[in-house]
Swiss-Prot record:
GO BP field: adaptive immune response; immune response
InterPro entries xref list: Ig-like_dom (IPR007110), Ig-like_dom_sf (IPR036179), Ig-like_fold (IPR013783), Ig_sub (IPR003599), Ig_V-set (IPR013106), IgV_Light_Chain (IPR050150)
Protein name (Swiss-Prot/TrEMBL): Ig kappa chain V-III region ABPC 22/PC 9245
Disulfide bonds: C23-C92
Note in the entry: The ABPC22 and PC9241 sequences are identical.
Domain of life, source organism: Eukaryota
Annotated segments matching region Framework-4: 102-111
Location of region: Complementarity-determining-1: 24-38
Ranges that cross the membrane: none
Keyword Disulfide bond belongs to the record: yes
Region (Complementarity-determining-3), start-end ranges: 93-101
Amino acid sequence: NIVLTQSPASLAVSLGQRATISCRASESVDSYGNSFMHWYQQKPGQPPKLLIYLASNLESGVPARFSGSGSRTDFTLTIDPVEADDAATYYCQQNNEDPYTFGGGTKLEIK
């Protein structure tokens, strides 16, 4: 199984500043010219919401403050600038190899 390791596990960012979350895969998630890495936001009592697909593509309706980058084994989610509504837990997920796996999550607090 591909193991996804997120860092940090939690972070506190001041309103209007930048938040950066990293995700490292135990092996490459690249195939056919794409990186099969995705980012989700989850708030308590709600299902995960897709933010970024294929490493860097913004899901429809998601603000451009969210961006993703990376390839092979190292990926980053950036939120810039952070807004109060961004307080949530963020997860990376790969679907390059079955079983599809998630990172352990990063809890974002807004100061």
